[in-house]
From Swiss-Prot:
Functional note: With S4 and S5 plays an important role in translational accuracy.
Pfam (any one): Ribosom_S12_S23
Signal peptide span: none
Entry-linked InterPro entries: NA-bd_OB-fold, Ribosomal_uS12, Ribosomal_uS12_bac
Protein name per UniProt: Small ribosomal subunit protein uS12
One GO term (biological process): translation
Species, as recorded: Petrotoga mobilis (strain DSM 10674 / SJ95)
Originating gene: rpsL
Listed CDD domains: Ribosomal_S12 (cd03368)
Gene Ontology molecular function terms on file: rRNA binding; structural constituent of ribosome; tRNA binding
Length: 124
């Protein structure tokens, strides 16, 4: 408990909020180039081969990104747009690739939730 004198001299220090996506440096998205595209197994109760990409961002930082949706066309040297957002069962994966922009094509045959996977409206 500070004294009145201490409060006058130093004031109260505000708690700094720690960012969940530090590599983006406060930007909503960042462009990057795929260095490696591979798969990864999730944490304990789950079992799968999750698609991930190691991406070198335009600010020089290298991050591991998740590739959402079924199937993808990404390979080494593909240009991608990266956004924040972790994958709960993949440790160390704190970013996602935005589908439907740059070299990342949208998910084929997607009918619902298309905007999240960069899929165009199907012809009726």
């Amino acid at each position: 408990m500070p004294t009145i004198n201490q409060l006058i001299r130093y004031g109260r220090t505000s708690v700094k909020k720690k960012t969940k996506s530090p590599a983006l440096r406060g930007n909503p998205q960042k462009r990057g180039v795929c260095v490696r595209v591979s798969t990864m197994t999730p944490k304990k109760p789950n079992s799968a081969l999750r698609k991930i990409a190691r991406v070198k961002l335009s600010n020089g930082i290298e991050v591991t990104c998740y590739i959402p949706g079924e199937g993808h066309n990404l390979q080494e040297h593909s240009n991608v747009l990266v956004r924040g957002g972790r994958v709960k069962d993949l440790p160390g994966v704190r970013y996602k690739i935005i589908r439907g922009t740059l070299d990342a094509a949208g998910v084929e045959g997607r009918k619902q939730g298309r905007s999240k996977y960069g899929t165009k409206k199907p012809k009726a």
